[in-house]
Amino acid sequence: MSEFWLISAPGDKENLQALERMNNVTSKSNLSHNTKFAIPDFKVGTLDSLVGLSDELGKLDTFAESLIKRMAQSVVEVMEDSKGKAHETLLANGVDLTSFVTHFEWDMAKYPAKQPLVSVVDTLAKQLAQIETDLKSRTAAYSVLKANLENLEKRSTGNLFTRTLSDIVSKEDFVLDSEYLITLLVIVPKSSFAQWQKTYESLSDMVVPRSTKLIAEDNEGGLFTVTLFRKVIEDFKVKAKENKFIVREFYYDEKEIKREREEMTRLLSDKKQQYPTSCVALKKGSATYRDHKVKVAPLGNPARPAAGQTDRDRESEGEGEGPLLRWLKVNFSEAFIAWIHIKALRVFVESVLRYGLPVNFQAVLLQPHKKSATKRLREVLNSVFRHLDEVAAASILDASVEIPGLQLSNQDYFPYVYFHIDLSLLD
């Protein structure tokens, strides 16, 4: 199970014996795997300050857990074609999350225990707040790129009726800057190629002879050029439609074509450079700007690499990790580590508030073996530590008993200090 129970009991002889009894029972009954959870000695300060820290740490705990879950989900979104590998990506200090929790050691360099508790908590809060700020800005940029790439895919796929033509046509395909002549693009069904060649000149008056040329085709038809006088455009469209030849509304604008091509190149470059491991929009097997499925006639070569693109560049496209995924991996680790440190702080603060001074308690990490055993495990703990708070222990059995001064519901209160750690971050 990816669930842990972090508990503590007083460190006197009687309660250490109780912990030993708990270990024996849970081991023999195969209820949980238990390990000591080392927490350093902190500067306690006043009890009033601990009460305030208890509330602050509770909020920080909730915030940290929410943050790492959002980061885990972001990893899944970036690795759209590798969701099964997301768990392998979510590490803490280079190890899997379970190993990190079960072998937890307080990071003295990052969070010095000699500092006042308030300072340690403040350091953790600022660290997590900065990670969240960066996460928001980076995922917002990712979402914009994803939306733009999805739009690009829509424009770069589909049939000749709907797809962009900027990557198909060239200036040489058109008669431009003529007062009298214009070049139209006509979509002809595959079965009617021969008919088009025989009849296009006679569909209307003033069609330039031998002016047609096939510039692209897909599975359904072909895209032909035809040049005619401007004055017969409407007549030609009507006659063409009668013969199931459809004039595509397209007029060559060199500036617009250049702008669209540059936009496509930029988006694909952003996708490759920023998120090479993600399939943010251009899924495997779908058409793309550089590698579309439309077969282009000799006027252009779609297989030709973009300017400055080497064979190595093309072979390595999609390999490696982009900045977003690298950032997520590094900062997920940092946020997760901070979260477990917060859990340790909560155990320390609650143990001092519960068991008093001088500081003397033992924290233990329990990993239930299976979900069905958690009820029995809870019964064992309540029985072993019942003596710590007879009123609270009784109230567990009698929900009508109110515990004076206790803000939690009785179902959330136990005679021992207890915090839950759930590593099911992607569920």
Curated annotation (Swiss-Prot):
Domain of life, per lineage: Eukaryota
Region of interest: Disordered: 298-320
Signal peptide: which range, if any?
none
Q: Tissue expression, per UniProt? A: Predominantly expressed in the lung and kidney. Isoform 1 is lung-specific while isoform 3 is a kidney-specific isoform. Isoform 1 is localized in the lamellar bodies of type II alveolar cells. Isoform 2 is strongly expressed in the cortical and medulla collecting ducts and is found in the plasma membranes of renal alpha and beta intercalated cells.
Q: Name one GO biological process term.
A: positive regulation of Wnt signaling pathway
Q: Which UniProt keywords apply?
A: Hydrogen ion transport, Ion transport, Transport
Q: Name one GO cellular component term.
A: proton-transporting V-type ATPase, V1 domain
Q: Which PANTHER family match?
A: V-TYPE PROTON ATPASE SUBUNIT C, V-TYPE PROTON ATPASE SUBUNIT C 2
User: Belongs to which family?
Assistant: Belongs to the V-ATPase C subunit family.
Q: What is this protein called?
A: V-type proton ATPase subunit C 2
Source species of the chain: Mus musculus (Mouse)
